[in-house]
């Protein structure tokens, strides 16, 4: 197993390559300790910063970054950190040519080619290629959620999930769809959205072969085969496979009819009933003129019982 120093270097690279996010109580060797130090998400090789703190006056960390103010105990650590601003990536993989800003990151990346997984979970024996991945995995066993949102108090086990959640409060959406321009707060949300353009359906049902673009859609579909109905009505106890079906059913108890018809004022409990009703209005009010062949509608005051076979233009000629 790699030494403790190598594990610390890989954890530092994990933060610098993918996300720089320190929460109060966490501290890496030689780095300033902040409640929220910095959030760095790769968006077209640009940096997105959030809640940038003022540097500490701690004499134990005299080397401050001129770009963001973060302080370090060693000049060499500052030099490594500076690459997050300059974009310099001097360490190249001999297998695929991919470049990295830290040597430890190249070492960790090399395991994707060799298949080496030196970090093993003592709980379930699952193995990982990076110490940080093992540390995140172990929180599934311990239930630890060290990342707390200062806005709503919600806690997260992974810094990446916490960073994405913060954008709910800030409104930041750095991931834009190249096809339609729609922006998203997380890369995973963008990846799911892009399937609406590509038509990709990577999730297949093992029972019937039906494919889905979203894993959540597959999970819902599976209930057709398993008969699972996890959503229970609190009033009558009836169970449903989908939350939307439960919401529609609940209106039989509350009497709510949220879909009003603008033509006649009648209200409906289900959207499907409302749509069917609207089509009935359209059929009654749409006619083909016997004179010119164009379709036309009757005035709102007219009824289906007194239609005319000619449009107003032909009728007046």
From Swiss-Prot:
SUPFAM superfamilies associated with the record: beta-beta-alpha zinc fingers (SSF57667)
Keywords: DNA-binding, Isopeptide bond, Metal-binding, Nucleus, Repeat, Transcription, Transcription regulation, Ubl conjugation, Zinc, Zinc-finger
Glycyl lysine isopeptide (Lys-Gly) (interchain with G-Cter in SUMO2) crosslink residues: 33
Keyword Transcription regulation tagged: yes
Zn-finger region bounds: C2H2-type: 63-85, 91-113, 119-141, 147-169, 175-197, 203-225, 231-253, 259-281
GO MF: sequence-specific double-stranded DNA binding; zinc ion binding
Gene Ontology cellular component terms for the protein in this record: nucleolus; nucleoplasm
Listed InterPro entries: Znf_C2H2_sf, Znf_C2H2_type
Any Pfam family matching the protein: zf-C2H2
Keyword Zinc-finger included in the entry's annotation: yes
Function: May be involved in transcriptional regulation.
Protein family membership: Belongs to the krueppel C2H2-type zinc-finger protein family.
Name of the protein in its database record: Zinc finger protein 771
Organism in which the protein naturally occurs: Mus musculus (Mouse)
Classification lineage: Eukaryota, Metazoa, Chordata, Craniata, Vertebrata
């Amino acid at each position: 197993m790699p030494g403790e120093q190598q594990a610390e270097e890989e954890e530092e690279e994990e933060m610098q390559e993918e996300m720089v996010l320190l929460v109060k109580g966490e501290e890496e060797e030689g780095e300033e300790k902040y409640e929220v130090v910095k959030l760095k998400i790769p968006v077209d090789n640009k940096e997105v910063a959030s809640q940038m703190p003022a540097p500490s006056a701690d004499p134990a960390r005299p080397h401050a970054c001129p770009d963001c103010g973060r302080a370090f105990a060693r000049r060499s650590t500052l030099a490594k950190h500076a690459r997050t601003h300059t974009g310099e990536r001097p360490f190249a993989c001999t297998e695929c040519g991919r470049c990295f800003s830290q040597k430890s990151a190249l070492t960790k990346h090399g395991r994707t080619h060799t298949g080496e997984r030196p970090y093993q979970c003592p709980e379930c024996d699952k193995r990982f290629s990076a110490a940080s991945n093992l540390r995140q995995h172990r929180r599934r066993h311990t239930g630890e959620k060290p990342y707390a949102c200062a806005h709503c108090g919600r806690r997260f086990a992974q810094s990446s999930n916490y960073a994405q959640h913060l954008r709910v409060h800030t409104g930041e959406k750095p991931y834009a769809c190249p096809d339609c321009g729609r922006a998203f707060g997380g890369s995973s949300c963008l990846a799911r959205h892009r399937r609406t353009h590509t038509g990709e359906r990577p999730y297949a049902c093992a029972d019937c072969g039906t494919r889905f673009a979203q894993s959540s859609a597959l999970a819902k579909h599976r209930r057709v085969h398993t008969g699972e109905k996890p959503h229970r009505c609190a009033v009558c106890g009836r169970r449903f496979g989908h939350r939307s079906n439960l919401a529609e059913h609940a209106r039989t108890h509350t009497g709510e009819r949220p879909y009003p018809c603008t033509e006649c004022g009648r209200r409906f409990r289900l959207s499907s009933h409302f749509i069917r009703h609207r089509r009935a209005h359209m059929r009654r009010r749409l006619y083909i003129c016997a004179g010119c062949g164009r379709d036309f509608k009757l005035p709102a005051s007219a009824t289906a019982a007194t239609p005319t076979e000619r449009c107003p233009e032909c009728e007046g000629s």
